[in-house]
Design a protein with these regions (language model features):
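A short, Lys/Arg-rich alpha-helix, primarily the initiator
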Residues: 1-18
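Short, basic-rich loop-to-helix N-cap that marks the start of a DNA-contacting helix
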Residues: 44-54, 63
Length: 76
């Protein structure tokens, strides 16, 4: 099981798209810049814990649900 720097962004993008949200909407709800979210989703910037927490809540998820999804992605 190897952690990939793009994994966090991949999972966030997947969950955002599943909910039919734009980057603009999600970033606004999470209180972060859209460009920051873009960099996270592209894997060029790693979010800190607080940012992951804000994004999870904006997606109406528990942060642990995002982590669980990352674990699933690692297994595939």
């Amino acid at each position: 099981m190897q952690f990939d720097n793009t994994l966090v962004g991949k999972v966030i993008r997947k969950k955002r798209e599943q909910k039919g949200m734009t980057q603009e909407l999600l970033s606004g709800l999470a209180g972060i810049a859209r460009t920051h979210l873009t960099m996270i989703e592209n894997g060029t910037k790693q979010p800190n814990f607080e940012t992951v927490w804000k994004i999870a809540l904006a997606l109406e998820l528990k942060p642990s649900e995002l982590v669980e999804e990352m674990e699933i992605e690692l297994e595939d």
